[in-house]
Amino acid sequence: MSPLAAFEAVADIRPQRAIHTLRDVAPLPNSLAFAASPVKTANAQFLADALDVLLRQSPPDEDLSDFLFDAVAHFAAAEGAATANFNASFFYHLTYFLGISPNLEGEGSVFDLRSGSLAPAPPLHPDYVAGDDCDALRALARVPLRHCGMLRIPRADRARALDTILRYYSIHIAPLDSLASLAIVRSLFT
């Protein structure tokens, strides 16, 4: 099975065991889409690596689980622009569930990555974006993940938007720039 593949299984969970046993494992239908596409498989590996870092210390959260399950199903069915825009849109919308959602409403032409909000002028630190990069983040904020294929973001702007969001996570949760799978995804989508 590929990373992020959803499956059904019977689990034998015993409190005394550190490792639990699974049997009768069967992939769910949308999981087969990853196996058919090398691009989606590479992207699923990156998402799994990033989620491992970001969610390592997270307590169980049903809303987050629902979001992740729905997002993976959407990505499995995505084609064209929806596939290309998925990473940036997914990581932007994931911020809501991790309690670090940026505030992109109101006036301001600069997004301060440390405060997570718009500002009228650049801050005194280097962690901010402005211009087209700020506009790309606003576009991601306006469009729900399931409609990310409707976004018309040029390839270079999309790559910078993803880099900005990953920097945002690095500031607020954990660094993601050292993931080996990130280089592969960058070569595919940038």
Predicted feature locations:
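Non-catalytic alpha-helical scaffolds and adjoining flexible linkers that form interface surfaces
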Residues: M1-T190
